[in-house]
Amino acid sequence: MATATLAGITVERDDEGYLKNPNDWTEEMAPELAKEMGIDTLTDEHWKVIRFMRQDFQEKGQVPTIRRMKVAGGIPVKDLYNLFPKGPAKKAAYIAGLGKPHGCI
Amino acid sequence: MKHLLIVGGGTAGTMMANKLAPVLDSDQWRITLIDEHETHYYQPGFLFIPWGIYNKQDVIKPKRDFYPSNIDVIIAPIEIIEPDANRVKLADGRVIVYDLMIIATGSRINPGETEGMLGDKWHKNIFDFYTIEGATALRNFIKYWEGGKMVVNVVEMPIKCPVAPLEFVFLADWYFTEQGIRDKVDIEYVTPLPGAFTKPIAAKFLGEFLTKKNIKLTSDFSAGRVDQENNTLYSWEEEAINYDLLVTIPTNMGSEVIGRSGMGDELNFIPTDPHTLQSKKWDNVFVLGDATDLPSSKAGSVAHFEADVLFENIQRYIDGRPLKAAFDGHANCYIESGFGKGILIDFNYDVEPLPGKFPLPGIGPFSLLQETRMNHWGKMTFRWVYWNLLLKGAELPIEAQMTMAGKKRV
C-alpha cells in the first residue's frame, strides 16, 4: 500500500494501484488514472461508463460486473471492450476509483 | 400448522429435505418440496460420459427414491415466486403458501447468451458437457473422431464446478493417447481467467499440468461470438481461434423462475448472506447451493457444507434464536487428471488451495494439490458416496468448516 497525489489530493492506493477508499476519488483524478491504464483521452463514452459504475457502486455497494453494466447500465459489451481494451471491468473500476472487482472461483 | 417449502429437489434441496424431515416437529411443521423434473442426474458423472467411462444409465436415478417419505412432493413447474406475499404460484394455477422457504433451484448453462452458439452446428461440432444431451452427443462425436483441433472454452465466470473444464482437457489428453491418435489432436484450453485457475498457487500447479500434457493455454480470452460457418471462436476484441471441435462451457445462470420473480441478480443468482445463507431481502427465505450469488464454488461439495450450516440455522430461525454465521465458503474438489490419477483441492473464501494431506492431517489417505492414484479412487468412489450417503443427508467424516490441519503454507 502506498500514498500518492492525484489531482492535488493525497490518496491511499493498494499494491496494484487501486484507490483504497472510493470516497477519496474525484472526477479530476480520472484522466490521470486513465493514463496509467494506457488510455490517453477520456471521451463522453468513457465517462458514461465511469459515472454508471460510481452510481451503481453507491447504490449496491459492489463494483458492477460487465454483465451488470450491460443489463442495468445499457452499455453494450462490445463498447466496453473498445473503450477499455483488455479487461474492461478491472480498468474501468481502476479509473473510477473503485476497488478491484472480486473474481469468482 | 406451519409450512416449510423447499423449492428445488436437486442435490441441495434433497439433502436439506432429508436432514430436516426427521427433526422438525411434525405436529407443528409440514414440509413440501417442489421440483419440475422426475430424474436426478449425478452431474459430476457427466465429465466421464464423452470418454465412454460412464454412460447415461450410470448417472440417473428417480428423484423420488431420495426424498423422505414423510414430506409432500409436488412435481410441477413454478409460474412465479412471490416472497413479499409468502407464496408460490404453480404453472397449473395452484397456489402454495409458506411460512419458511428454502430455495435450491441451482444453475444451468445458457448457450443462447453467446451470439452464434446455438446454430445448425450445435451438438454437431459444438458441444457442452454440462447436460446429459450435450455429454452423450459429444460421446458420439468423439467415438468416431479421427483428430483435429479441439478447443475447450469457458465463456464467462462463474461456472458450475470450475475445475471440470480442466479435468475435461486432462481426460482428453489421456483418451486420445489411449486411442493412439494424440499426435493428431491439438488441445487448446481457452479461459477468461488470467491463468488455468483462479487462485494463484493452484493456478500455477494446474498450469504446469497443462504444459506437461502438451495442452495449449490461452488466458484472458473473453468469448464474444461463434462463427459456425468458419469454425471460429471470437473474443469481444476480435481475437480469433479456429477449431474443428468446440467444447463450450457456456454462461451459467440461475433458474428462469428466479429471474421472473425478481429475486435474482443479472445472472438470476439470489443475493444471499455469505455466512448465514439467509436471503439478503427476505428474512424467511434461505438459499442453498448453486442458486446463491456467493463467491464460493458452485459444486455439490459446497452445497453439502452449506447444508450442515443451514440445517442448524433453520432450527435456530424456527426457535427464534440468532442465526449462526458459520459458512466459510468451504469447497472440496477431486480433479481427475487422467491415466488413473487425480488431484484434490480443499479451500474456502479466505484460504486458497494448499498442499497437504486430507482428511486426516499427515496421514491422508488423500493428498492435497498433488497427483496420486488414491485421489483418483476418491473421485470414482464418490459416486457411491453421493447416491448412498450425501443425498440422504448422512453425516460424512468431513467438517463443514475448512481446517488448516494437514495443510502446508507455501
Each model region followed by its residue ranges:
Chain A
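A short, structure-level motif marking secondary-structure boundaries and short turns
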Residues: 14-16, 50-52, 74
